[in-house]
Amino acid sequence: MCNLYAQIASQDRLRHVLDAVVEDDDEVIEDLTGNLPAQPGIFPDYPAPIVRRTPSGVQLMRARWGMPSPPQYLRTARDPGVTNIRNTASPHWRRWLGPANRCLVPLTAFAEPCGTGRGNQWFALADDRPAFFAGIETRGWRSLRKVRDGETMDDLFAFLTTAPNAEVAAVHPKAMPVILTTPADWQTWMGADWAEARHL
C-alpha cells in the first residue's frame, strides 16, 4: 500500500501540463496553490496538490490525503482516512467514481514498503514525463481526523490502486497506484464515464 510519495515538479511545469488536461480553449485553468513548494515526502493526512474539474475548467489546488473511511471500519469518532482505494465495487466508493469527483494527483516518485525494518523502495518513471495518480476527491467533508484539532471541514483525496507491474511486484505483490502518463489518459480519467475510465 502506497503511503508515501513525492511531488517535486515545479509549479510552473504543473501549470504547463494542465494545458493538456483541458479539452477546449474556453476552459479556465485556475491555480489556488499559492507558492507551491517541492514535496519530497508526502504522507497520509497531509495536504498535497491535486487537479480537479470545476464548471469553468480545471483547478490546481491542495487537498488533504485520505478519503472518508467506510463507517463499518471506524471504532471511534476519529477517522484517519483511506489513502488507497482498490475495491471500486464497494457502495462506499461508488458515489465518488463519477467525473465530478475524479482528480489527478501529480507525482514524481512513490514508495512501497520493503518489509518490517527494511525501509521503502522508491519507484519513478525512467524519463522525465509528467505523471499523475488516478484519484478521487470530495469537497467540504466534516470529520475528526486528529483529536487535538477537533472536527474539521476539508477537501479530501485518495488514489486508486491496481495489480502491480513486474518492477513493483518484486517489492509489493499486492497492488500499486494507478498511474496515468499521457494527455489522452488524463482527459479520459477526468471526463469519461466510469465504464470507460475504469480500464485505465
Where on the chain are the PLM-derived regions?
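Short linear sequence motif anchored by a di-proline
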Residues: M1-L200
